[in-house]
Amino acid sequence: MAGSTEFVVRSLERVMVAPSQPSPKAFLQLSTLDNLPGVRENIFNTLLVYNASDRVSVDPAKVIRQALSKVLVYYSPFAGRLRKKENGDLEVECTGEGALFVEAMADTDLSVLGDLDDYSPSLEQLLFCLPPDTDIEDIHPLVVQVTRFTCGGFVVGVSFCHGICDGLGAGQFLIAMGEMARGEIKPSSEPIWKRELLKPEDPLYRFQYYHFQLICPPSTFGKIVQGSLVITSETINCIKQCLREESKEFCSAFEVVSALAWIARTRALQIPHSENVKLIFAMDMRKLFNPPLSKGYYGNFVGTVCAMDNVKDLLSGSLLRVVRIIKKAKVSLNEHFTSTIVTPRSGSDESINYENIVGFGDRRRLGFDEVDFGWGHADNVSLVQHGLKDVSVVQSYFLFIRPPKNNPDGIKILSFMPPSIVKSFKFEMETMTNKYVTKP
């Protein structure tokens, strides 16, 4: 269900929330992955929606503010500031001054949000966003805004500095804050810093990112808009079953939906058949590290996987063929972990057009939908891409998140692409999925 998403939010209070217990003053080093371009200065935002119909008398802002103070004892870097070192890398100064907390009130009820299917500028009111030109040393590593609606429901908008945590780390933090809100004494998963495991002098992934930036000229897309499309679990399972009958191979939901979106975007952009297209997606590398990183590690540990194909082959071949290309790219990271991330890949594609590159990110298992502040799990989770700077490695990308509770097993695709191809992209997606769903 779509909402009008036109509403007004009034800020009631803006305060710094310090840890409930004194934290040691110190400078903490970030890892090589934390300091990568496209990561270190990036801000990622999450919206958690709660209907809260059964505890209307309880003030969520008060509960969450107190929980924030308690959880910062265990996550003290979020109560500090980022600082630039002489070599240009960032480090964290644990000052103990706290995270920024904002209490706000909307002039309507939650129905205005619908299922958060489409982006609206009004949604940015649910987050506290600094001007785009704000220096990295002046930002708050963590901002939490609680916006109450007239029906008693509320939205928690959280902005994380990507240099301190990745998506899994952010989910771990929010789950811990929920535990504090529900009266737990300490987080169930102990947070671990240990960024020294990835030493700054290691070439771990740094070369790959710099190399990628060098071969990609500035985009000519211009404006990028945010949209969404939900693929139901029934549709996904139907396609997976068809591919299994065709090949006797298991295909994951991510592989199937990524292949569909890659084909649909390529066709919608009408890229010449003689050119190549590249798909880039992220994979968690915690289990690949030797020894494996502890569960509580919340720093960046995501690797970039690349798959490339010729446009003519991509569009004329079968869906199974594209799924296999994605599978092969995933296996390459598992099998060649060290060599893949330390040395440049052979056969680099310096001539590929920037517009022919698309990024994918799977946010379904980060734990955001499990965050419980005392009102149960979030009824809906979404993202608003409002970063400080345009430092993304790719401008056109897709993020996979869980749909609202009424369709928990499907995939909601958040798309970021030129406005001129939004309709054609959705048309191509529907055409392909219908071919499998209506198959006799």
Curated annotation (Swiss-Prot):
It comes from the Eukaryota. Signal peptide: none annotated. Its EC number is 2.3.1.167. It catalyses: 10-deacetylbaccatin III + acetyl-CoA = baccatin III + CoA. Pathway: Alkaloid biosynthesis; taxol biosynthesis; baccatin III from 10-deacetyl-2-debenzoylbaccatin III: step 2/2. InterPro entries: CAT-like_dom_sf, Plant_acyltransferase. It is an enzyme of class 2 (transferase). Keywords: Acyltransferase, Taxol biosynthesis, Transferase. Disulfide bonds: none annotated. GO terms for biological process: paclitaxel biosynthetic process. One of its GO terms (molecular function) is 10-deacetylbaccatin III 10-O-acetyltransferase activity. The active site is at H162 (proton acceptor), D372 (proton acceptor). Monomer. Belongs to the plant acyltransferase family. This is 10-deacetylbaccatin III 10-O-acetyltransferase. It comes from Taxus cuspidata.
